[in-house]
Amino acid sequence: MIRNITLGKVNNIRKSIILNVLASISNLIPFIALAKIVETLFLNRGADSIDTSLLWKYFGIMAIFFLITFLLENLAAKYTYELGYKTSADGRIELADHIRKLPIGYISGKSSAEILDTLMNDFFKVETAVTHQLPQFISGICVAVLCSILFLIVNVKMGIATLIGLPISVLLLTLMQNFQKKIYLKTKKMRIKEEEDINEYLDAIKTLKAYNSLDDTLTKLEEDIDNSRDANIKSEKGVGSLTTIASMILRIGLPLMSLVGSYLFINGSLEIDTFLMFLFVGTRIFDPLELALVNYTGLQMASVSGERIINLLKAKPMSGNFDVNESNKIEIHDVSFSYKESKVIDNVSLDINENELTAFVGYSGSGKSTLIKLISRFYDPNEGTIKIGGVDLLTADPDKLMDKFSVVFQDVYLFKDTIYNNIKFGNENASKDEIMNAAKMAGAYDFIVKKDDGFDTMIGQGGATLSGGEKQRISIARAILKNAPIILLDEATSSLDPENELIIQEAISNLIKNKTVVVVAHKLRSVMGADKIVVLNKGKVEEVGKHEELIKNEGLYKDLWNYQEKSKEWKIVQ
């Protein structure tokens, strides 16, 4: 459990635990001194004089250890909080960096809400455990053990009476571990589902308005939120009731100790000083013990969160440490790939020559975009090999490999930042002149400078404040700025209006000069001049050749061409 909570770094918390244990022990000593003061006053109640020096000695001990406790608690708190927040912050950075190195296939298999829940809520649980729950739990247990030994040495009967509820409480909570874990996992699953639905509701708000489906979707969202609420209430009731029962059983020791002590004292079997020690010190151990029991439940939840974080950190990153060669020839040999059970690429072999334009065409679902993602190592093939410059992608250093690529997708993602910084994302070391020039080559400069803040204009998250054509041009500008030798274009103009399409086609022409280019084409006319056109059908290579050759073959490519030519005649009629 402790290993999960500390994310495998148990040694980091030792100092914090030791300081908290010392503070708890130090906090007990003034009450032992108080018991001795009361004993002295009680034993000398009929005497003519009392040894005040002895009383001052006990008062001095109380004052000194109250001060020591204060210093230890402050030192422990300072160290614990620094450690907890540092563990959480460093852990989030480590996990974010680790996610960057994971295959896209692994990440796409998880929802963004699930990963975000781990980065935020799971780390918050771990943070709370390290800063509060774990030190209090361990110091409470240590105090209980030390006091138990002391009590049993001083008086076995009183010791048993005081601590009789402790093993029962611990046994109860131990037996209910799986129940607590099951409840916590269920509530976490409901919360992730709720977060997913809220994100989907916000992302789809325009579509929902267009179809007047807001009420129906809101009703579904309300159901999910209500289910999450009910699961949390049920969890709190179940775990809370369990903790309350355990605390009640633990505190049975207090009245039982008083009852047994009174009986033994009346019968002369217990000295007054021993009875007073149990009354003063015995009552003090119940607070840290009860706090330990309460924290135990929280630690169980934090342990589950820590386990989720560790499991994500254990996810195997993309392998490879070999340098990539200067050659940019792409060789695909007997490659097959499946999304779960569905085979998308089936035994494809293909050579893509350096400094040539190769186009992938075919019906929707034929594997065009998937092949692009395999080349850029967003996914790894299930079978076969892909090489660039003779180096197998699986053995190439992932960061150095990605330096070879500039990728322009149909769906462009822009960051919530200025236009300038979004373009600079292509090359963080680029000068202002280089960024301006990239914008001009991408056909983006004119529309940028017309905006009130020009290049300093803030973009909404995902580029929400820009048109599709504007987003695409900024995407091409940062690809130009990166100046990678291999360009991958995934239907970059398929959803644009004619004016934007023409501008972006000119921008792409600037981007791909003297590069190795692979393009997924929706409109066949845009790739008529390609050096090589690869026709894909159901994940297999159907035809390969230039436009004129493929038309003469009268195969699938010609069928696609005829369909597109015929579609020009289509009109909306009523």
Language model regions located:
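Transmembrane helix-loop-helix hairpins at lipid-water interfaces of multipass membrane proteins
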Residues: 14-72, 153-157, 269-272
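Hydrophobic/aromatic residues in alpha-helical transmembrane segments
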Residues: 30-34, 76, 80, 95, ...
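ABC-type nucleotide-binding domain
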Residues: 326-574
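Cytosolic ends of transmembrane helices, especially the final helix of ABC transmembrane type-1 domains
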Residues: 213, 237, 285-312
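Hydrophobic alpha-helical segments in the permease module
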Residues: 58-73, 166-170, 239-253, 272-294
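An intracellular "coupling" helix at the cytosolic face of ABC transporter transmembrane type-1 domains
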Residues: 5-11, 104-105, 121-130, 134, ...
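Transmembrane helices of ABC transporter permease
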Residues: 12-23, 62, 135-186, 257-270, ...
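Short intracellular "coupling" helices and adjacent cytoplasmic loop segments at the cytosolic face
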Residues: 85, 93-117, 121-123, 197-220, ...
